[in-house]
From Swiss-Prot:
The keyword Acetylation applies. It is a multi-pass membrane protein. The gene is TMEM243. Widely expressed. One of its GO terms (cellular component) is membrane. This is Transmembrane protein 243. It is found in: Membrane.
């Protein structure tokens, strides 16, 4: 009888991936770094929307801030569901894509707010 430690379960090699709902230390660090940087960028963008270029803020700046806030709420809901175990692990790529889109939207908004390129 073969040893339990050497079973490959149909994969090309030993399968040491975490089970559903478990995360490795590397994944937790990546999630913390991505989440922290994204949160900081969103905060800077929302503050910039209301402060720059002068007070009172332009309506387009407020529109940018609302769009970024709504996108962020959507991402937070997906992250909450993922952490609860309601979503399959394949949705992690979707969450990363949404976060990347939010980061790009924040960069575009900040470039617009600060009149870069004019």
């Amino acid at each position: 009888m073969e040893d339990f430690a050497t079973r490959t379960y149909g994969t090309s090699g030993l399968d040491n991936r975490p089970l559903f709902g478990e995360t490795s230390a590397k994944d937790r660090i990546i999630n913390l770094v991505v989440g922290s940087l994204t949160s900081l960028l969103i905060l800077v963008t929302l503050i910039s929307a209301f402060v720059f270029p002068q007070l009172p803020p332009k309506p387009l700046n407020i529109f940018f801030a609302v769009c970024i806030s709504l996108s962020s709420i959507t991402a937070c809901i997906l992250i909450y569901w993922y952490r609860q175990g309601d979503l399959e692990p394949k949705f992690r790529k979707l969450i990363y894509y949404i976060i990347f889109s939010i980061i790009m939207l924040c960069i575009c908004a900040n470039l617009y707010f600060h009149d870069v390129g004019r």
